[in-house]
Amino acid sequence: TVHIRGRIRVNSWRLSEDEAERRVRALESNPPIEQDGNTIRVGHIQDSSLRRNVSISYEIVVPAETRVASMTGSGNQTVAGVQRPLRVETGSGDLKITGVSEARANTGSGNIEIESARGNVYAQTGSGNIQAYDIDGGFVASTGSGDVKLRQAASGSVSVETGSGNVEVNGAKGSLVLHTGSGDITADGVPRDPWKLEAGSGNITLRLPPTAAFDLYAHTGSGGIESDHPITVQGKVNRHELRGKVRGGGATLEASTGSGNIRIQ
């Protein structure tokens, strides 16, 4: 069973009271809901004269196994408990997603928050922060301007890019690719697969377990490199560049910043 509740709002300062009332009554008598078999489409107002200066907020309750694709030109969206692949988009607004399987979230301008996902997650915003917690799969995120924070709960590849903002990843258990044009990068986890971290301008901090074994390449254009882990250095020792093996070597760990310090803890 699907339950749909809508709240109609009319910008009455641009319309007469009678015209505003007419539009509300027209939408109430013929709500923008279409059903074709098992597919339900909500929110498409065919009459262009009714669309102007009118907005509708929806509260929709569906079975957990419903496939949901939700798109709006402007507005916030909250989705919880959907166990089929989910797609959520808004031109401008915040997105909050909780307790889902696979999810794709996109906003032109706004923040994205995702918690407890059992599959892969894809998140993109033109301007805004991205936060994702307890992700049980892969994670791909990008923002033109904003911070990205991830707490990973199970193995999966991670790719994060921000034009300007900080990147923080906790519990990484798979391959890791992190990039920021301007901002700091902080990552902790177990580098069993290749890690590549790049900052145009900012510090890079890695927190690794005391038993971690990996091949290290670290480079900074302007800054220092410090490591709490024993490194068998390969090549010349240089304040701005370090190459070597930690505990016999393993997966490749590459960290580079144009301007900033690199610290391996």
Stretch-by-stretch model annotation:
Residues 1-265:
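Intrinsically disordered, low-complexity terminal regions
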